[in-house]
Swiss-Prot record:
It comes from Prochlorococcus marinus (strain MIT 9312). NAD(+) binds at residues 199-201, 233, 262-267, 285, 320, 341-343, 386. SUPFAM superfamilies: Formate/glycerate dehydrogenase catalytic domain-like, NAD(P)-binding Rossmann-fold domains. Substrate binds at residues 64, 138, 198, 228, 232. GO terms for molecular function: adenosylhomocysteinase activity. Its EC number is 3.13.2.1. Binds 1 NAD(+) per subunit. InterPro entries: Adenosylhomocyst_ase-like_sf, Adenosylhomocysteinase-like, Ado_hCys_hydrolase_NAD-bd, NAD(P)-bd_dom_sf, S-Ado-L-homoCys_hydrolase_CS. One of its GO terms (cellular component) is cytosol. May play a key role in the regulation of the intracellular concentration of adenosylhomocysteine. Transmembrane segments: none annotated. This is Adenosylhomocysteinase. HAMAP family: AdoHcyase.
Length: 472
């Protein structure tokens, strides 16, 4: 298994689509830095201290312009980094080129094959005679690869029955690695201090491992920091969903009937996004609390089966499996748009469409003819639409998320003795600090409590202002 299109030197290995795009990438990174005050403040605060000196971070997260600012912040704070994207379509090639041009190992290009994806994930874990000691994950693929690979070292039969194309590529990549390095996964796993996880789906995987007493190292759940989930997931999706649909299709959203499946933070932002452009938005939910929230926001709460033939735009935002199945797909109206804004590609049963005629319109936009003769427009092959068909969330909201990531890496790397093999969240005072770092940029001024007021509600003048279980 050879890495194609790579350049190897004494300082770096990288795989990018076109290294000549680095100047373009650098220009956009400079603009993004002006919109990412949290990360820039951490550079100023910690640059001389270098709290990540000695950290060797294997990063698996969308290789975008905003992620480039995160990577360079980690490096400024002393870390060594190897990076891959956590999605085959989400890389911005000029961002990857700009990072590679700085001598940082990056393995990412837009439109990777599944085989390439798992090759590149192996690359961030393979440091030759050395080893990474931290993981920064988005969706849990880097963590999951180490765990599954360690199991395969002991019993190769765990790789015998792949369930889909993704697992075929994953299992083959592990078999290939074990042919030349029989204890690679367990060796690397034993050197990992901990992982910081970015997204809802990856966090769910971590909690499942914790429940099974199978978590191999401590983990910090960055996703459930308030300044991540209530900003990135909500406000980020509110802007990036319609951006991606319009870039992909040029469709008029006003007047269209849209169905958002899932009304968590991502679903809430998605529903607001579509309604903001004049769509008639309906919501499908399994959780009665979220369903009631949707109804109170003025959305019709329906089931997919009841409305499937009437919907113009389908958006899945559940983090679940086979939310839209073949029996739903074949009933869709002509030119219905189908997309997913959850992390993985299995919310929509795309595999069941493979036997139907496909016409590629442009990258990540496919026309599929159903048995009825109707055609549907599938975006990003059912993968993350906002990164497959657009450039993801705006820089400012990603500054919130990535500031949390940097703080989590600093915390776990420097205070590993405090943490058992469990899943943790960042403390409230750090959440509030992240928010403070972003207020000046938008001209927001905080009111300050008096000592008497603080005493009256039993908090410190400087915070934290809410109990840990407060629901924002």
């Amino acid at each position: 298994m050879v890495i194609a299109n790579s350049v190897k030197s004494s300082t770096t290995n990288y795989v990018v689509a076109d290294i000549s795009l680095s100047d373009f990438g650098r220009k956009e990174i400079k603009i993004a830095e002006t919109e990412m005050p949290g990360l820039m403040a951490l550079r100023d605060k910690y640059q001389s201290e270098k709290p990540l000196k000695g950290a060797k971070i294997a990063g698996s997260l969308h290789m975008t312009i905003q992620t480039a600012v995160l990577i360079e912040t980690l490096v400024d704070l002393g870390a060594e980094v190897k990076w891959a994207s956590c999605n085959i379509f989400s890389t911005q090639d000029h961002a990857a080129a700009a990072i590679a041009d700085q001598g940082i190992s990056v393995y990412a290009k837009k439109g990777e094959t599944l085989d390439e994806y798992w090759q590149y994930t192996h690359c961030i874990l393979d440091w030759g005679a050395d080893s990474p000691n931290m993981i920064l994950d988005d969706g849990g693929d880097a963590t999951g690869l180490l765990i599954l690979g360690s199991k395969a070292e002991k019993d190769l039969s765990v790789l015998d029955n792949p369930g889909n194309e993704e697992e075929i590529a994953l299992f083959n990549s592990i078999k290939y690695k074990l042919e030349t390095d029989s204890d690679f996964y367990s060796r690397i796993k034993s050197n990992i201090i901990g992982v910081t996880e970015e997204t809802t789906t990856g966090v769910a995987r971590l909690y499942q491992l914790q429940k099974q007493n199978a978590l191999p190292f401590p983990a910090i759940n960055v996703n459930d920091s308030v300044t991540k989930s209530k900003f990135d997931n909500l406000y980020g999706c509110r802007e990036s969903l319609v951006d991606s649909i319009k870039r992909a299709t040029d469709v008029m959203i006003a007047g269209k009937v849209a169905l958002v499946m899932g009304f968590g933070d991502v679903g809430k932002g998605s529903a607001q996004s579509l309604r903001g452009l004049g769509a008639i938005v309906k919501v499908a939910e399994v959780d009665p609390i979220c369903a009631l929230q949707a109804a109170m926001e003025g959305f019709s709460v329906v089931t997919l089966d009841d409305v499937v033939e009437d919907i113009d735009i389908f958006v899945t935002a559940t983090g679940n499996y086979q939310v839209i199945t073949n029996k739903n797909l074949v009933k869709m109206k002509d030119e219905a748009i189908v997309c997913n804004i959850g992390h993985f590609d299995n919310e929509i049963d795309v595999a069941s469409l493979k036997d139907y005629p496909w016409e590629n319109i442009k990258p990540q936009v496919d026309h599929i003819t159903l048995p009825s003769g109707n055609k549907i427009i599938l975006l990003a092959e059912g993968r993350l639409v906002n990164l497959g068909c657009a450039t993801g969330h705006p820089s400012f909201v990603m500054s919130n998320s990535f500031t949390n990531q940097v703080l989590a890496q600093i915390e776990l790397f420097n205070k590993s003795e405090k943490y058992a093999k469990e899943v943790y969240v960042l403390p409230k005072h750090l959440d509030e600090m992240v928010a403070r770092l972003h207020l000046d940029k938008i001209g927001a001024k905080l009111t300050k409590l008096t000592e008497e007021q603080a005493d009256y509600i039993n908090v410190s003048v400087e915070g934290p202002y809410k109990p840990e279980l407060y629901r924002y």
